[in-house]
Amino acid sequence: MDLIQTLEQEEIARLNKTIPAFAPGDTVIVSVNVVEGTRKRLQAYEGVVIAKRNRGLNSSFIVRKISSGEGVERTFQLYSPLIASIEVKRRGDVRRAKLYYLRQRSGKSARIKEKLA
């Protein structure tokens, strides 16, 4: 392991974040810290994980949800200080690592089967 990887591992250990195991197809609730002026509050963002990028400290994931009939996608950095918590609501049974095809689908065709056990 080279120096950069070692530093990234130390930084991840220092952050001490508990991140649940989740994969594309899973429905997650991401609690985000939102600062509005002097007020600070938590905002829940619930949707389906359509992509996950594992790059150590630079890991990220994309969550897609339908908000008032319009598809909304948001990219989150996994180790961001803005993320308060990640909760897995249900596990999805998919055969792809990237679910970008869900962007073209709507309604019943965009449903994902639930993983049993």
Swiss-Prot record:
GO CC entries: cytosolic large ribosomal subunit
InterPro entries, sorted: Ribosomal_bL19 (IPR001857), Ribosomal_bL19_CS (IPR018257), Ribosomal_bL19_sf (IPR038657), Translation_prot_SH3-like_sf (IPR008991)
Record flagged with keyword Ribonucleoprotein: yes
GO biological process: translation
Keywords noted in UniProt: Ribonucleoprotein, Ribosomal protein
Matches recorded under SUPFAM superfamilies: Translation proteins SH3-like domain
Entry's Gene Ontology molecular function annotations: structural constituent of ribosome
Family assignment from sequence similarity: Belongs to the bacterial ribosomal protein bL19 family.
Function according to Swiss-Prot or TrEMBL: This protein is located at the 30S-50S ribosomal subunit interface and may play a role in the structure and function of the aminoacyl-tRNA binding site.
NCBIfam families assigned to the protein according to its UniProt record, in alphabetical order: rplS_bact (TIGR01024)
Protein's name according to its UniProt entry: Large ribosomal subunit protein bL19
Lineage: Bacteria, Pseudomonadati, Pseudomonadota, Betaproteobacteria, Burkholderiales
